[in-house]
Amino acid sequence: ANGGDVLEVQLVDKVLSPDGSVVMEKQPNITSHLDGVDASLSVIRQGMKGVISAEDGGTASEYFRNFDYTDQVGAKTGTAQVNLIDLENNAWFVAFAPYEEPEIAVVVFIANGYKGGVASLTSKDVIANYFERKNNPEIDEVPVQDSFVP
C-alpha cells in the first residue's frame, strides 16, 4: 500500500505524555524497495477495496455491511486448508487504512477459524478504533502504571 517500500517492523511510532507532548518518536526506516510494484499496485488496491464491498460481492462484504469506514479500507481474505480430520481451515485477513494514504496495516490469523471472512471481524474492530481515536483524539486515555486501556 506504500508503493513498494519495505519498512522495518515497529510497533510504536511515538509516545506522548499526559499533556500531549512527544516523549519519543521513531521515523519509519525503509530497508529496501520492490521494483515493478507501481505497474500493478493500482489493480491490486482496487481488488483489495472490492473484498469488503457489498456492491462487488467481496469475500468479506457481509462482515463490513453498515461499517462506517468501508470506503477507507483495502483488504484481502485468505483460507489455508487443513487436511487433518476434525480440524477446520485456518483463517487469514489483512487490511490497510486509510485507503488513499495508508497509515496502518492489520493482519489477523485464526487457527481453525474456518474462512478468512471470520478473521475480518477482529480487523474491523481495530480499524474502527483507529479511526475513532484519529478523529477524536480527546478520547485517548493514559493508563496508570501496570494497567491496560483497550
Q: Model-flagged regions — what are they?
A:
Residues 28-38:
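Short surface loop/edge beta-strand patches of beta-sandwich-type extracellular domains
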Residues 137-150:
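Short, highly charged C-terminal tails/helix-capping segments
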Residues 1-18, 22-30, 48, 52-137:
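Active-site beta-strand/loop architecture of penicillin-binding DD-peptidases
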